[in-house]
């Protein structure tokens, strides 16, 4: 093997290693951007809830349980209508999304509890009005029964608005650790550092092939296409598999919300993969154009 051939061989080996590292860094960058732009983006969840009428389903479930409770106690089912509105349901759920995202970004120490005082006061007002309109005497037994009824109604509202006690969960060591890691991944310096590393690696490939400029676009293109294919195949294969349609959650509206959120994750991941693939193809097209011109000239000379 001649000296020139050996140099070319070493260049290809070094370029391959740098190209592989570039692919890995691009993969980490795309995952970080996905985490920041999709998982820690409140609009991802609010958009799904609005699009698929999850707020209405929560609202309907609350009143369905309240109506059942009232009927089982021989009370007209619409007696407590108005204790909570659809706007309040969406407001509370959205606030919980904002609080949770803020906690995961390490912007808050914990996730606050739901303020039930508004519903307690409103429920008490509705019950007092009902007693007054029906001229009912409030003895000790009735008072105890009403207190028990109020407690059950408030539990129904709270359990549908807060399926998981995020306030208690946010105080656990495990969740605190997850929040800290999440905040690091989401931080600007991490993303800027990865992008800077991408630029450095592209610069190194350009330096290796400074005399053969077309070749550098090929190696850079390989990195982007490899990364894009990995991201695309993970997202697309998950999306078409439909595994998210079999989420084992007993609460129908929660299962539906989780299904569409996972579907949204996979769709966004697929789109990211397509964008990276497109960038890779753009780099490769420069190399392909060079090859086309080169071999076109060869064929012309031969003819």
Question: What residue spans do the PLM features occupy?
Answer:
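Juxtamembrane interface at the cytosolic side of transmembrane helices
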Residues: 7-17, 189-241, 287-302
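Short, membrane-exposed interhelical loops at transmembrane-helix boundaries
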Residues: 249-266
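Short, Lys/Arg-enriched N-terminal segments with co-localized hydrophobic residues
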Residues: 1-5
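Membrane-helix interface motif
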Residues: 34-38, 237-250
